[in-house]
Every structure is written in C-alpha cells, then in structure tokens.
C-alpha cells in the first residue's frame, strides 16, 4: 500500500498505518514516517482542539458529543486519545475509544488511541506527527484528548489552536 496515495484518498486504514509507523521506535520506521510527512504541504486548514482535565472528569464523554456536533456541520473529525501506558508493555491501558461508541461508528470520524509511553505533559512524543497525518488525510477538526493530567502538564497547548480544560 502506498501510504501517500491512500492518505490523499482519505483512507482511514492508511491513516492508522501511517500513525503506527510514526509511533514506532524502529529507526527505519521513523525514516519512512518522516519522509511521508514531508511529502504533504505545510498547510493547516484544520481546527486543532486540545481537551484536558483530571482523570474521570468526562473528557471522552464530552468528546463523543462535541465531535458529533462538528460532524452534523459537515466536518470530518479525528480524535487522538492519549492514554496512560502500561509500564510493562508501553501499550495503552484505558481504551477511551469505548466511551465514544457513536462517534466511532460514524464514517466521518476517526478515533485513534495511543499510549503516552511514559512521556509527561499529557501527550505522546509523536502526537504532533499524528496531527499532521490526520490533516494530510483531510480531517477538518482534530481533537487531542490528553491523559488525565494536572495543571502543570500542558504540552498539548503547544500543538493545538484551542485548549479546553474540563473540571
């Protein structure tokens, strides 16, 4: 599969593969990911929204409704749900996607859970690349849901246009 061609066709499977490549710790995957991202124009027509708050405040439930509002306006919505990592496997342990069931079923939505891999700041070290790939795949609204964080972990604010703190 040529990821560049498939991303231009708005293929969600290609987007998933491209994000997996970006998140990989293998050097060869990083090189491929960097080359892929560099092929896309550096335009930013999307709206990037960061959503943060303490664990259990309702971030995923809010995103479920918020994302549907954008879809009803004719927008394509990507959600990058950053979860805490298992110390053993470094994989995601919560699975916020299950709390966005209706949004996940919509053909104009893409939800990607990703582990933070122990990185502080509420996001992963590859969240920026994931945002760029979602933009390349034609998403109008990109929502980044952080790990439930405290007030000092606001790295996401450097990656988004709008930051929402749920309390």
PLM regions and their residue ranges:
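Hydrophobic anchor at the beta1->P-loop junction of P-loop NTPases
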Residues: 49-51
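Walker A/P-loop
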Residues: 60
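Nucleotide-state-sensitive switch-loop elements of NTP-binding domains
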Residues: 2-46, 57, 66-152, 156-166
